[in-house]
């Protein structure tokens, strides 16, 4: 199975991302429900501009993070580590992403928080269900996939 396809299928079944940003040597992490766009290889999240992580991100920033399940046994561990870029969406781009997000999470219709995109540039997917320590790597810029 193609690496990005396997990663995308797994990410589509999850819903919480943890991401971290840094500003002037200070690190901060946050969690949010996400919508995964397999075509753009990006997460869409909602977060208020007044939050510490949004203020540290500004309009655009480097980001790293994880998505993982909570299995009770090592043999079932699956998870993603990533790096990329976070940016606040504006205009039509924001509206399209919000509509898709609201379809996935209808309760979000009541929120006015801005929509942000986390573009994934590097993904490492660990899937112990395929064998202990099995890792798949995807890189945006090189088109490289490693199993």
Swiss-Prot record:
InterPro entries to which the protein is assigned, alphabetical: Split_barrel_FMN-bd (IPR012349), UPF0306 (IPR011194)
NCBIfam families (alphabetical): PRK03467.1 (NF002900)
Family: Belongs to the UPF0306 family.
Entry-linked HAMAP family: UPF0306
Name under which the protein is recorded: UPF0306 protein YhbP
Gene (name only): yhbP
């Amino acid at each position: 199975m193609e690496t990005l396809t396997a990663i995308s299928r797994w990410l589509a079944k999850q819903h919480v991302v943890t991401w971290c940003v840094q500003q002037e040597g200070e690190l901060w992490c946050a969690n949010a429900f996400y919508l995964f766009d397999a075509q753009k290889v990006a997460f869409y999240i909602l977060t208020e501009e007044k939050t510490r992580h949004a203020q540290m991100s500004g309009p655009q920033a480097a980001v790293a993070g994880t998505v993982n399940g909570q299995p009770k046994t090592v043999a079932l561990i699956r998870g993603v580590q990533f790096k990329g870029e976070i940016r606040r969406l504006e205009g039509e781009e924001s509206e399209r992403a919000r509509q898709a997000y609201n379809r996935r999470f209808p309760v979000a219709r009541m929120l006015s928080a801005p929509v942000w995109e986390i573009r994934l540039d590097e993904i490492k997917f660990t899937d112990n269900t395929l064998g202990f320590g099995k890792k798949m790597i995807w890189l945006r810029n090189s088109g490289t996939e490693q199993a």
